[in-house]
Each structure stands twice: as C-alpha cells, then as structure tokens.
Regions:
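Exported/periplasmic ABC-transporter solute-binding proteins
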Residues: 8-58, 65-68, 72-76, 87-89, ...
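Periplasmic N-terminal soluble interaction domains immediately after the signal peptide in Gram-negative
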Residues: 81-82
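N-terminal signal peptide c-region/cleavage motif recognized by signal peptidases
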Residues: 2-6
Length: 255
C-alpha cells in the first residue's frame, strides 16, 4: 500500500490564486506542507481569467480571488462551495521616479493630459474594476473626471495578452521603470513591492474621498483533492492570517 506521503507526491493540491497573492500563497503553501499537508501546486493570474478557466472545466482544489464576485459566481453556478472572505487590500497609486504627486494632488495629476495613468484590465482582473470605481468617485469630486480617466487609462496588466514580467520581478516595477505609466493604480501590496524594486518610485496613498477597498475571497472548487478543505481552513487560521499580514494584507479579524 502506498504511503500517505507517496500519495501526496503523486497528487498535489492545486490552488488557483490572484497574482497579487503570489508571495502570500507561496509562503502559506510551504507552511501548510511542512505542517503535514500535501504539496501544493499553484497557478497565479488575474482572478477573472482564472474563474473563466474553472468555468471551462479546470478543477483546482481551491480558488483564491482578489474579489468576492468571482468565487460567488462559481458558487451560484454550482461549481464550488461558498465564497469566504479571508483578507482585505486597498488601492494605492504607484508613482514613477521623478513624478511629483501627493495624496492631495493625485486626482489633478491623473487628469493632466501628459500624465500616463496605468491600470489593470476590468472584468479580467478585479484591480481594474477597483480602478474604475475610483474613477466614479473622482467624478463626484470633479464632474467630467470619469470620462477623462476612462478614456486615457492604459490597461497594461491583467488581460489575456498582457506582458509577463521577468522571473522574480514585479510587472508594475517593470512598467514604471520603462515609463509605460507615470502613475499606476494597483493594490497597495503590489505598489509596495514595485517601489522596493525601483529606485525613486513611490507609493502614494489614495485620499479617503477616492479610496477603494478590496475584499479577497476563496472557495473550495474540488473537495476531493487532498487537503483542499484543510488548506482553506489554513488560510483562515492564525498562522495563515499572520502570513497575509506580513505581506501587507489586512487580516479578516482586524478591526
């Protein structure tokens, strides 16, 4: 009879997760396995595109999304269990080196014709959806801002044909360094990583009137995979939440 270890070696738990969760889920997977769980095979990408892959028949054990809607949709379609919020994030602005911008001047700078505003791709990637929510808030402060930002925003990441970064690099760091964008709207966790990689790049907080929060949810797609439900519980455990906090996310238990 094959041992549990050899069975795990033959049948790893497959986890699909949002790209912004790469560092956190990779760390959690290693911790989960070292604590006696099966090895974890991860696939990272835009949440909307991962959800489409599941709808077309792919079966990860667990799907962790950068929003609530994609896992909820799978649950409504009968393709997974319920969606459970496990972390929160926020939208920040990543400023390229030499771009003079503060939280107070952010909206005015983004509206300037010469400033290139980068975003992810709406519907394919929740980060893009959150950017457009910010544009809607901007319109309430400055009528016409939505139309301007909607027209000028450069959808540089999160799409089916979006460029991939070199191994070990943040795509946001690459795009900012190449000046594909002067200001990039992305998750604060992504912006912080990119700023660490790019000399002179800065993370700019988004003012409260424009602030957009992001709730991350997971769902068990295939409970028959070894450790699927255990991994979901591990993400929600004290250790899992500690790892998320270390990567800049707000744990679900935080006030």
């Amino acid at each position: 009879m094959a041992s549990a270890a050899s069975a795990y070696a033959e049948e790893p738990l497959r986890v699909y997760a949002a790209g912004s969760l790469n560092a956190a889920v990779t760390t959690m997977a290693a911790s989960f396995t070292s604590a006696g769980g099966p090895p974890v095979a991860t696939v990272f990408g835009p949440s909307g595109l991962l959800r489409e892959r599941i709808e077309k028949g792919e079966r990860p054990g667990v799907f962790a999304s950068a929003d609530v809607e994609h896992p909820q949709r799978l649950a409504r379609e009968g393709r997974s269990g319920p969606a459970i919020v496990f972390a929160r994030n926020r939208l920040c602005a990543l400023a390229a080196p030499g771009v003079d911008v503060t939280p107070e001047t952010l909206l005015d700078r983004m509206l300037e014709p010469t400033i290139k505003v980068g975003t992810s791709t709406p519907k394919a990637d929740p980060s893009g959806d959150y950017a457009w929510q910010l544009f809607e808030k901007a319109d309430k402060l400055k009528p016409g801002a939505y139309a301007t930002l909607d027209a000028k925003a450069l959808k540089l990441t999160g799409g089916p044909t979006s460029p991939q970064p070199p191994p070990g690099r943040s795509i946001y760091a690459v795009l900012i360094a190449e000046r594909k964008a002067d200001i990039f709207l992305t998750y604060c966790t992504n912006a912080a990583q990119a700023a660490r990689e790019t000399a002179g790049a800065r993370v700019v907080a988004i003012p409260e009137a424009l602030a957009v929060g992001a709730s991350y949810a997971l769902t068990v797609v295939d409970p028959s995979q070894p450790g699927a439900e255990r991994f979901a519980l591990f993400v929600l455990s004290i250790r899992g939440q500690e790892i998320l906090a270390q990567q800049g996310f707000t744990p679900v238990g935080a006030p």
